[in-house]
Amino acid sequence: MPLRDQSVTDWQSALDALLALPEIDGPVGYSGGVIAVGTRLAVVEPRIRAAVLFAGSFVPRATLGEAPRVTIPLHVLLQWDDEGNDRQAALALFDAFGSQEKTLHANMGGHTGVPQFAGAAANDFFIRHLA
């Protein structure tokens, strides 16, 4: 999956640049909307200690296959009536993640109906795992 792999390489380059700054230290989290990128990054990048993933994009078989290798804490957001994505595929991916700590936050509404409190819940997750 060339786009996913290039995105992961770009994220790793961004991490290299940010973590080289003297004012940046401590554990790193990831939050992103393309679940294939976030899953792959969680598998290959040991500097990522926790992730917030949006289950609102296509779930390729390769992503489902590598999900058991994701062992960091996860906070997964799912819009229950997302008109562009398969809910069952998102639930299967969540089930396949190998993380001992994973939470699924399902909200009513479509792809663009993410409630504002979802951001606060994601921030609280990062505070618990990165502070």
Report residues per predicted region.
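Short beta-strand/loop motif that positions the catalytic acidic residue
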Residues: 70-71, 76-78
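Conserved alpha/beta-hydrolase "acid-adjacent" motif
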Residues: 62, 83-89
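Acidic catalytic loop of the alpha/beta-hydrolase fold
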Residues: 80-85, 112-113
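Catalytic active-site module of serine/aspartate enzymes centered on a nucleophile-bearing elbow/loop
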Residues: 108-109, 114-131
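Alpha/beta-hydrolase fold nucleophile elbow
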Residues: 22-33
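Alpha/beta-hydrolase active-site loop
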Residues: 1-22
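A conserved short beta-strand
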Residues: 45-58
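Catalytic histidine neighborhood in serine/cysteine hydrolases
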Residues: 90-91, 95-114
